[in-house]
């Protein structure tokens, strides 16, 4: 438990004591928010908890603060003072921050991987784009958020499994094969009609060209049915390989790639049969309908069409049942915001099968808009279509793309400034963070060149400058931030924490010399920046971003 957690717990216990003493009426306690005051004369931490509690306790905030201060206990606390209308300023004993810093220094980066939690296994499914075309920037945001969330949950001690659901069954794959077939025939000078629901991307033409390069006119002698079957497998294999290559270049990997085909027909049929046995579906107009309105949906949903073909929902019901049957107790899906209407029907299906709907948690991603020179970028200059993830990586790099995707909460629309992402300046947040890491590494090279030995037992009590104290306090909050960000499914909090930590380091560096001062002070400052570097490297690792030694 870090110092802020200890302080929050002490405030909560003081409030509960006051309730037990009959001073405060019973009621739900307000959230306890602790901040570092801008001026050290106002203490090490401050809270407005007394003012937030005035309505609950029906008392003057200053009186609440007085009762709390008289009951707060902690051997790390020197004293507390009441300021203004009811702020409480806390002054820690001199050794507390230094003891915590020593713990982080001696424990190294491993300190920030929290103990394993005894909780249900979590599956995070994300991206899961149809293997019918290239990944676009919207998929890129989902890939960045999903992979960072998996890293974050693991750092917080949760048992996590990541998965990509391959939509390799159904009409979209038939349309893929038909599109490749049409382009193949066109390339060989044959008359053909392009399918009505076909895919027009340049990548489809490229796939057809590769078939011609490898096998020439071989497929002309086959029936259309045979040709479509062959092209379906060729195109699917190629598209999957491209997906995996693009995602790997974006520092995204999955524990499993799950094929929808494995659900057909048995798993889909079994799920529908279970729903029938439970009385959760009914026949109407030749189709099979899920009673999803019983679970809050705005209308019942078809699971088997009147032609006997399962809907996408039927496959999704079977897939989510499969996830739970594999032993995952909590499912996290990351979908685009345009899927918001689909959430209720999947939860309804799980409830109809007898599962708790809250076992499925759906995170909805908002849109990404690209800007260049202050103008909205609507289409790719290369293809005239949506900008692909591959093109984005080529233009700004993986690190910048990932950070910009992650620096806003996933439920916020993202305006992506391409010019800023490419700039090598402090205005570019990822450059600013990486430069802090590289600068610290440079400090250690300078120390080595100067013959300064690192290690030993640093005299942390020598760190008294306000920029040193501010940096110490920040890095000591990191473990708590990991816990909170994981709990809130908010990797953007780690992006912000890394940025703020880098800022405090730069302020410290600009004011305090590290190499070239007396040895005890130099050793303490070297140890401090070593811990700061560990924090930055660990945070960047969660975000899937490199931590360069030189820039």
Please annotate each region the language model reported.
Residues 1-98, 105, 109-551:
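Non-catalytic interaction-recognition regions
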